[in-house]
């Protein structure tokens, strides 16, 4: 606990909040090009093959982004839109690819939660 004299000499420094998605540079989304599309396994206790992509963003960063939904058409050189948001059981994956924009098509036969997977309303 500082004394009053110490506080007069130098005031308390505010804690600076670090951003959880620095590659977006304050933007809501960023465009990028896939450099590698592959699968990886999650941390314990989960088990799956999660689809992820290495993406080179327009901000110059090379990031790892998660591809949500069942099935995708992404491959190397696909242009994608990336948003923030981590995947809890994949260490180092702090971004999501937005489905239904640019080269990432929406999830096929999706009926519920369509807006999150870029699917138009079926008639």
Swiss-Prot record:
Any Pfam family hit: Ribosom_S12_S23
Gene Ontology biological process terms in this record: translation
Location of this chain's protein in the cell: Plastid, Chloroplast
Main location: plastid
UniProt GO MF annotations: rRNA binding; structural constituent of ribosome
Family matches, as InterPro entries: NA-bd_OB-fold, Ribosomal_uS12, Ribosomal_uS12_bac
Membrane-crossing segments per the record: none
Domain of life: Eukaryota
Assembly and binders: Part of the 30S ribosomal subunit.
Family to which the UniProt record says this protein belongs: Belongs to the universal ribosomal protein uS12 family.
NCBIfam families the record matches: rpsL_bact (TIGR00981)
Name recorded for this polypeptide: Small ribosomal subunit protein uS12c
